[in-house]
Amino acid sequence: MPPRLPLAQAARCCQASLTARPSVPASSPTSSLISLFAALSVQTRSASILASLSDNRGAYHKRIRKGRGPSSGYGKTAGRGTKGQKAHGHVKPWFQGGQTPLIVSHGRKGFVNQFAADMSELNLEKLQEWIEAGRIDPTKPITPKEIIKSGIIGSSIKDGIKLLGRGKESFKIPVTITVSRASASAIEAIEAAGGKIVTRFYTKESLKRLVEGKSLHTDKPLPVGKEHVEEILAQARSLKKKYYRLPDPTSRWDIEYYRDPAHRGYLSHQLAPGESPSLYFKVPTGGEKVKVVRADKVKASKTGDVASEKLF
């Protein structure tokens, strides 16, 4: 469709047609309409712009149709040549030209831990940016629920959230935050700004329940012992809605991590003064090491002394 004539230009044309024919009385509506259409009919408009439209250079790649005749340059063998592995099929991606494969001559190095927890990473500079934008309230405790719902780590929920220390130099906002794990630099920056950080054990399912409102957040573990059963049941019965409790760690590595005060773990209160967070290794004592001598060696040394006394 040709482009429309601008209104200003059409008005000028109509005015020119009326002034050019003074013999026709202006009171006749038929004659005035005829003169208007006559003025418009003499206007010539070019529609050749439609024929000159094209894509930018490099925006369009012509489709190559192979095996459609010799004039295309890709007929018969379709650019593959005649016979051979490359014409009939393709070389395997791991083939190295016939030499001894590097994986055979040098062996496999390293491994990928299939059981490692997949953590969502959160840096301090991103946290400060979200707080300054008003997307996270620093006056309230920041839990994984607030972090996930704010969209700061994306929409996908993984096995936990790890706080990292990039941007620690400019982080000056005191916050109370709970995450799955935290680096030493992030812990130092949070506490230097007057905030508090706690690391707690989560799973992918427990994080989903937190976001959906099916669990209540707490930084205290479930008490163990028969004396606590009635109290916990009474609290659960007093609530109108049934909630899932947050899980506690069961593997040795997780228990030792959250027992460590250096990680600000929520199980660190279980340690006695001077006790190691490890479940296996104990803190060495400051006294001298007592040498244990086997009884048979003591007996053998005594008989040797008696025999030497008899000889001399």
Swiss-Prot record:
Q: Where is this region: Disordered?
A: 63-89
> Where is the protein localized?
Mitochondrion
Grouped into one coarse class, the protein's main location is mitochondrion
Q: Name one GO molecular function term.
A: structural constituent of ribosome
Q: Where is the composition biased (Gly residues)?
A: 70-82
Entry keywords, A to Z: Mitochondrion, Ribonucleoprotein, Ribosomal protein
Q: Give the matching Pfam families.
A: Ribosomal_L27A
Biological processes per GO annotation:
translation
Q: Name one GO cellular component term.
A: mitochondrial large ribosomal subunit
Top-level taxon of origin: Eukaryota
Function as written in the Swiss-Prot or TrEMBL entry: Component of the mitochondrial ribosome (mitoribosome), a dedicated translation machinery responsible for the synthesis of mitochondrial genome-encoded proteins, including at least some of the essential transmembrane subunits of the mitochondrial respiratory chain. The mitoribosomes are attached to the mitochondrial inner membrane and translation products are cotranslationally integrated into the membrane.
UniProt similarity note: Belongs to the universal ribosomal protein uL15 family.
Q: Which HAMAP family does the record match to this protein?
A: Ribosomal_uL15 (MF_01341)
* Quaternary structure and partners: Component of the mitochondrial large ribosomal subunit (mt-LSU). Mature N.crassa 74S mitochondrial ribosomes consist of a small (37S) and a large (54S) subunit. The 37S small subunit contains a 16S ribosomal RNA (16S mt-rRNA) and 32 different proteins. The 54S large subunit contains a 23S rRNA (23S mt-rRNA) and 42 different proteins.
The protein's name is Large ribosomal subunit protein uL15m
Specify the species: Neurospora crassa (strain ATCC 24698 / 74-OR23-1A / CBS 708.71 / DSM 1257 / FGSC 987)
